Amino acid sequence: MRTHLEFTSTAFPAYPGEDKEINPGIFGKRLAEFLADGFRKKGFTVLGIGAEDWGWMVEIENREFPLWIGCASYDGTENEFQCFIEPSKPYVRKWFSKIETGPIVEKLATALEAVFLQSGKVSGLRWLSDDEARG
């Protein structure tokens, strides 16, 4: 499954004081706002964005299981970023059932890539292998 995407961009600089909301040296709020807008334009319902210690989360409405995209700069860089889709496994468990995640995750991955490619604001888009993502 395509769940981890890295790229380079100067379009998403840190907000002043952003490192007070998440870990120092990490940022991505502008990127999260950009993605939220892009996903809305692609027909997804965005529930909101939120700060986490590792970066920013863009929550996507999905009735079957929690669905979100994490995004952050690579630690100590100003223009290198990674986005990742959760869940990143082909199935999630809910009570006693096993729910397939692949179709909706792939739809979101396709939209994520399209938002970036159509914007012209990023370069070096690269999907990471499962081994690289776990790295």
Where are these regions (language model features)?
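Short beta-strand elements
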Residues: V46-G50, G124-R126
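Acidic, proline/glycine-rich low-complexity IDRs
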Residues: S73-G135
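Short, ordered beta-strand-loop transition motifs
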Residues: M1, G50-D53, S73-N79
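A residue-level signal for beta-strand positions that form part of recognition/binding surfaces
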Residues: H4, P66, E80-Q82
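Ser/Thr-rich, low-complexity intrinsically disordered terminal regions
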Residues: I49-P66
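Broad, structure-driven detector of short, well-ordered beta-strand segments within folded domains
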Residues: F65-D75
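N-terminal low-complexity, intrinsically disordered segments
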Residues: M1-R40, F44
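Residue-level recognition of well-ordered beta-strand positions that form the cores
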Residues: E6-T10, G70, F84
